[in-house]
């Protein structure tokens, strides 16, 4: 079972960071798991329910890509940008450069989807799963993926 929060329900004060471990994906990097702790549960990561306006999903090589109109999703993009900024600021890595990968992807009007088989629906809902932070000698950012809700 996954507990999904709306952006309005999300609370930065419920975020905790685990100790850094060796990153298995980025060479010479670290991974810091994020925990979301509410009064009656703790989640490994953050799960946010997002509803985009005017989407078009297409096959992109062996994956899927969702295109959307930036102007019609401006408020949602701004909210996600603020969440990303606040999470990276909360971890307080001085001397390193934050990488805003979620916002960079959104401002281009598309997201890459992680799914093997996508069913056609009229549903414009997605889950943004933020599992942690990655860190290198110079940069740091969030580890995330977008999942289509069927």
Which role fits each region the language model picked out?
Residues 49-51, 114, 145-147:
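Residues in well-ordered beta-strands of folded domains
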Residues 1-95:
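OB-fold ssDNA-binding interfaces and closely related basic DNA-contact patches used
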Residues 20, 53-55, 71, 116-118, ...:
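Generic structural motif
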Residues 91, 95-117:
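Beta-rich interaction modules in large eukaryotic scaffold/regulatory proteins
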Residues 105, 118-122, 135-140:
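Intrinsically disordered, low-complexity regulatory regions enriched in Ser/Pro/Gly/Thr
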Residues 113-127:
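Short nucleic-acid-contacting surface segments enriched for D/E, G, S/T with interspersed K/R
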Residues 130-150:
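OB-fold single-stranded nucleic acid-binding module
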Residues 27, 43, 104-106, 139:
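A generic structural signal for short, non-catalytic loop/turn and secondary-structure boundary residues
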